[in-house]
Amino acid sequence: MKTKQDFPSINERKADGVREDGTPYRVLIVDDSMFVTKQISQILTSEGFDVVGIATNGEEGLNKYKELFPNVDIVTMDITMPKMDGVTALEKIIEFDKEARIIMISALGKQDLVKKSLMLGAKNYIVKPLDRQKVLERILMSLQQ
């Protein structure tokens, strides 16, 4: 029978967003919905990730990525945004940095754009509404690729 000592306390457990050396993974969030950016930010920071930037459209996301490069480990990118959509921003970021890890965020019914994004180099995708566990799983999977 397992006792309390067999389970790490919340303070002893390594946060998912922290590397073995203790440094956090750095995330850029690109989404035009303040609700979504706040939700992703809360999920990730609670697990030790460092949100290094937030952008509200693809053009701003591209510029922020270039400004922060190479200090971004992963990007979450909404597909449908003003000024520059997420697919175009993905394409331009991949042109700039072939090693970029980008996860697309999509509403239901955007499967054609999700497929196109994956073909262009996105590492994974998340479908809205966001689920905490799925967000963490997809990000951690993409970081290991």
Which residue stretches match the model-derived regions?
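Acidic catalytic/metal-coordinating carboxylates
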Residues: 57-60, 85-88
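A Lys-centered signature of the CheY-like receiver
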Residues: 128
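Two-component/phosphorelay signaling modules centered on CheY-like receiver
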Residues: 34-53
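Receiver (REC) domain active-site loop signature in two-component systems and cognate sites
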Residues: 81
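Active-site beta3 strand of CheY-like receiver
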Residues: 69-76
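Non-catalytic signal-transmission and effector/linker regions of two-component phosphorelay proteins
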Residues: 1-26, 133-145
